[in-house]
Design a protein with these regions (language model features):
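N-terminal glycine-rich anion-binding loop in soluble enzyme alpha/beta folds
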Residues: 2-79
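N-terminal glycine-rich phosphate/adenylate-binding segment common to multiple enzyme folds
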Residues: 70-102
């Protein structure tokens, strides 16, 4: 079965929003994390705050050693979130690793 699709080019000039939301949060989450993105979505007003996420590798089980392995990965992961753009906050979605790393 064939379909004919008729399209007309738009005459409305296209432009991207410079910054569609007032505040930006860069969230680094663990690859195994099931909740951080949903938690941020529930507490942040999407018309005012954008949450932009990147994940880092993480191997279960949770031990001091596996938590320490996340440290060297954080800078590169955060840098990949909206590269060349300013963010207002960088959050790391792992309290246990934050404590172990200091």
């Amino acid at each position: 079965m064939a379909f004919d699709i008729h399209a007309t080019p738009s005459r409305v000039p296209a432009r991207l929003d410079h910054r569609p939301v007032k505040k930006r949060i860069a969230l680094v989450a663990l690859a195994t994390d099931h909740t951080s993105e949903r938690d941020f979505a529930r507490i942040c007003d999407p018309d005012r705050v954008g949450v932009y996420v990147n994940r880092i590798a993480y191997e279960n089980p949770t031990t001091r050693e596996t938590l320490l392995k996340t440290g060297p990965r954080l800078t590169a992961a955060a840098a990949q979130i909206l590269p060349e753009e300013a963010v207002d906050v960088v959050a790391y979605g792992c309290t246990a690793a934050s404590i172990v790393l200091g």
